[in-house]
Amino acid sequence: MSPMAIEPAGDPEHGAFDRNDNADAVVRSINETHVTYKRLGKTGLRVSVPILGCMSLGDKHWVPWALEEDKALPLLKGAFDLGLNCWDTANVYSNGKSEEIIGKAIKTYQLPRHKLVLLSKCGGYVGEAPNVKGDRYENAISRSKDYVNQGGLSRSAIFEQVEASLRRLDTTYLDVLQIHRFDPNTPIEETMKALHDLVSIGKVRYLGACSMYTYQFAQMQFVAEKNGWTKFVSMQNHYSLLYREEERDMIRFCNETGVGLIPWAPLASGMLTRPATQKVPEGDRAIINRVQEVAEKRGWRMSYVALSWINKRVSAPVIDFDRIDRIEEALATKDKELTAEEEKYVEELYKAKDVEGIPSQR
């Protein structure tokens, strides 16, 4: 990726910059930055495009494709050096190991905390053994003597989970705390007041939410607004060329109310980065074929098409990477745009699907 080649500008009051002073360091920094930064919704906080997803960092006992510490640490350092300084994790990812690796990277490489934007999540159950995935048990886990009150969005659970995340990350605050899902078993007022109090005492700076039904998100926002409490500034939902159900309500609601969209699975678990196989459902395969066709005509990678499409519609997508060259590939989308005709071409075959990523309320 070629640098911007910015030269030190003259100063009307003090004249041209001395090429040996600190101004040149700023110019070098600008030229070495390959990332776009966008406002998170209507806030003043700017996040990197994309946001580095850290679900894949952790322990192979949790998921077999996890990047363990020896590979995860240099990946984080490489991402930071490229300017990808917004990292999204969760307390449940590898049962806390993802957060621990991030904390170790900050300490090992002496990364300035104020130059990072750290996002984590609460609400899920952190397993006491490496191979435990709390979401497998749905509501049943809350009846366990070992896990009662350890998840969900009660005031007690939220405070305990955030304190644990801060210890693992070895930091005093989270830039954005996200609730991982809606909790139908806790009053909304209790949840929103607890989240607001964390902002008030400085342990959290912004609040976000993840996949839920639009009416649930709207209720939570309305409760916060009614009581003068801190509202959510971001929504991390499921969105890609292969899954657009969020366009019905959630995306419209967020756009109208200034909530930033930071979707997960923007590349559909890699399906939008390579030609479709016969195992891919027919409807998805037809869309992927069109993405491939546009990419070939442009001389692009398929990921450029998928990311160009989604970058135009959100604050920043959340993407997990396993290698530095794949980060560089995503960053190469920076100056690429689809034409209106190309957008229509890759969109028009989409057909409605069943809702994904939102647990049933039972």
Curated annotation (Swiss-Prot):
Signal sequence extent: none
GO molecular function, one term: oxidoreductase activity
Pathway: Secondary metabolite biosynthesis
Gene3D superfamilies attached to this UniProt entry: NADP-dependent oxidoreductase domain
Catalytic machinery residues: 93
Pfam families membership: Aldo_ket_red (PF00248)
Listed EC numbers: 1.1.1.-
Keywords carried by this UniProt record: NADP, Oxidoreductase
Binding positions for NADP(+) per the UniProt entry: 88, 210-211, 236, 265-275, 322-330
Induction field: Expression is positively regulated by the cluster-specific transcription factor MYCFIDRAFT_198930 and is up-regulated during banana leaves infection.
Binding, substrate: 180
InterPro entries assigned to the protein according to its UniProt record, in alphabetical order: AKR_Detox_Biosynth (IPR050523), NADP_OxRdtase_dom (IPR023210), NADP_OxRdtase_dom_sf (IPR036812)
Functional description taken from the UniProt entry: Aldo-keto reductase; part of the gene cluster that mediates the biosynthesis of an emodin derivative that may be involved in black Sigatoka disease of banana. The pathway begins with the synthesis of atrochrysone thioester by the polyketide synthase PKS8-1. The atrochrysone carboxyl ACP thioesterase MYCFIDRAFT_190111 then breaks the thioester bond and releases the atrochrysone carboxylic acid from PKS8-1.
Family: Belongs to the aldo/keto reductase family.
Protein name: Aldo-keto reductase MYCFIDRAFT_87468
Organism: Pseudocercospora fijiensis (strain CIRAD86)
